[in-house]
Amino acid sequence: MAKQSMIARDVKRAKLADKFYAKREELKKIISDANSSDEHRWAAVLKLQTLPRDSSPSRQRNRCRQTGRPHGVLRKFGLSRIKVREAAMRGEIPGLKKASW
């Protein structure tokens, strides 16, 4: 089980990313727009830098929903490989079975 503080930190980052999503996208659009003036683009870059670091979606970590484990997480299930295996062995995931060939 991951430390509760690490899980809480990721939850906080997700909330910040949602809060600043629109503003961040607007600034990125200005920066990537070739028609805008250099001063306008530079002002957008500086404004983007003033936003909180944790508001960037790339700072979030995929974590297992049950254990909070940060590595070996399968996106399709939102669980770590260990928990997916346990659930599959108990037959809790429909259509998923152990491979045999």
Swiss-Prot record:
GO cellular component, one term: small ribosomal subunit
GO biological process terms, semicolon-separated: translation
UniProt KW Ribonucleoprotein keyword: yes
One Gene Ontology term of the molecular function aspect: rRNA binding
Keywords: Ribonucleoprotein, Ribosomal protein, RNA-binding, rRNA-binding
Entry annotated with the keyword Ribonucleoprotein: yes
Coiled-coil annotated spans: none
Highest taxon in the source lineage: Bacteria
Pfam family, one: Ribosomal_S14
Complex formation: Part of the 30S ribosomal subunit. Contacts proteins S3 and S10.
Record family assignment: Belongs to the universal ribosomal protein uS14 family.
Its biological purpose: Binds 16S rRNA, required for the assembly of 30S particles and may also be responsible for determining the conformation of the 16S rRNA at the A site.
Protein known as: Small ribosomal subunit protein uS14
Gene source species: Actinobacillus pleuropneumoniae serotype 3 (strain JL03)
Lineage: Bacteria, Pseudomonadati, Pseudomonadota, Gammaproteobacteria, Pasteurellales
